[in-house]
Amino acid sequence: MTPRPSPMYLFIAAVSWPLLKGLFRLREKGKEHLPAAGGFVLAANHNSNFDPWPLGITLFPKRYLRFMGKSELFWTPFKQFATAAGAFPVRRGQADMEAMATATQLCREGHIVVMFPEGTRRKKGLRKKYEARAHTGAARIALDANVPLVPAGIVGTDRLGKLAQLRVAYGPPIQLDDLAGREDAPQVATERLMAAIEDLVASA
């Protein structure tokens, strides 16, 4: 059974859909690559704190997203809002095993978990894959949960103030089957993932 979103998530998405489609002219491509059912890790480049927004709207209303949010967001009065919006806390700057375990379990339960391998927003002008240090968390979660690892490229979220067009491109799941049992599986999968993300950003 596909997990269902909270009423707050539905409200946010319903209000956001005409805003993103109209004001920001949101366009997406490659949705045919997304698994129709079941959990998976959706990994994208990280331009701004608004990155989950267009991802969620392009999949609404058929699927909804879960994503890590910095632990500072989970203080009253924002905790209930963040949780209802699909977020769960992560302590940035350290290996948060609890957040990783939560993400892995959510994938196993059929959720789509959004990850940003770069960990933090790219500095202005940072575009090439060798300039952005990627973490292996997204690949580790996909490998541990035995779910697809799907790349996405996001363009425009760092220029919302200029009403830049928002574009999202999805790619086919990263090849993981040949990595079974390899100690370097997370690193190799991450290298493949980041190469795919960079191609999607360029073509979005």
Give short role names for the model-derived ranges.
Residues 1-25, 75-85, 160-163:
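Alpha-helical membrane-targeting segments
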Residues 12, 35-94:
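Catalytic core of membrane glycerolipid acyltransferases/transacylases, capturing the structured
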Residues 9, 15-46:
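Helix-to-loop junction immediately C-terminal to a conserved catalytic motif
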Residues 2-8, 98-204:
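Non-catalytic C-terminal accessory region of glycerolipid acyltransferases
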Residues 19-21, 60, 81-82, 106, ...:
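A generic structural signal for well-ordered alpha-helical segments
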Residues 28, 75, 97-100:
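Structural motif corresponding to alpha-helix initiation and N-cap regions
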